[in-house]
C-alpha cells in the first residue's frame, strides 16, 4: 500500500487508475513523452486520485529521481522505445535496490498472435536486454493469452 509505482508509457492512464487504489499511502507516477496524455491523466485524477502524479519523460529519460521507485510497469511500451539502452539505464537508476520491473509484451514466439512483428518481443530477447541493464529475471507468468508478463528485479546489493 506504500509502494511508489511508475507506469512508463502511461498513455491516458488505463493502468494508472487501476493501480492507484492499490497503493493508497504510496504514489503512482504516470510517465509519458506526450504532454497531451499527461493532461488527460491530470484531468481524470483531479479530486479523485490524490496519489497520482504525472511526469513528462523524454525519449532517453523517464525523469524520475534515482532510487525512488518500487515497481516499474511497462505495458506494450518497451518495444516502442527509440533509445532502449538510454531508457533502460534511466529506469534502472530510478528503481530502488530490490525494486521490480513488470514487462508486458506480445509474444514473438507465437505466430498466432496477430500483431505486427515489430510490436512483439520474445522472452529470450526481453531477458537478454533487461539483464544487460543489470536487472535479474525473476519469473514469467502465462496469465495473459497473447503476451508475456515478465518480472525483473534490481539487485539489492
Predicted regions and their residues:
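Core SAM-dependent methyltransferase catalytic element
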Residues: 137-139, 143-157
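A short glycine-rich, Lys/Arg-flanked "PGG" loop and its adjoining helix->strand segment in the class I
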Residues: 85-100
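Conserved class I S-adenosyl-L-methionine
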Residues: 100-127
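A short SAM/SAH-binding and catalytic strip from SAM-dependent methyltransferases
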Residues: 70-85
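Class I SAM-dependent methyltransferase SAM/SAH-binding core
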Residues: 4-62
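A short acidic, Gly/Pro-enriched loop at the edge of an enzyme's catalytic core
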Residues: 62-71
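Helix-to-beta-strand junctions that scaffold the AdoMet/dcAdoMet cofactor pocket
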Residues: 23-24, 81-82, 95-97
Amino acid at each position: 500500500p506504500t509502494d511508489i509505482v511508475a507506469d512508463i508509457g502511461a498513455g491516458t492512464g488505463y493502468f494508472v487508475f487501476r493501480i492507484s487504489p492499490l497503493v493508497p499511502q504510496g504514489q503512482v507516477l504516470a510517465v509519458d513523452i506526450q504532454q497531451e496524455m499527461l493532461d488527460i491523466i491530470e484531468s481524470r485524477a483531479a479530486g479523485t486520485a490524490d496519489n497520482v502524479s504525472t511526469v513528462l519523460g523524454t525519449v532517453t529519460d523517464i525523469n524520475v529521481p534515482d532510487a525512488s521507485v518500487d515497481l516499474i510497469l511497462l505495458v506494450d511500451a518497451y518495444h516502442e522505445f527509440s533509445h532502449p539502452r538510454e531508457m533502460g539505464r534511466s529506469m534502472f537508476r530510478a528503481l530502488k535496490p530490490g525494486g521490480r520491473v513488470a514487462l508486458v509484451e506480445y509474444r514473438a514466439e507465437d505466430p498466432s498472435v496477430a500483431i505486427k512483428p515489430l510490436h512483439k518481443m520474445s522472452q529470450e530477447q526481453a531477458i537478454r536486454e533487461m539483464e544487460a541493464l543489470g536487472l535479474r529475471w525473476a519469473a514469467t507468468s502465462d496469465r495473459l493469452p497473447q503476451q508475456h508478463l515478465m518480472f525483473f528485479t534490481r539487485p539489492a546489493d
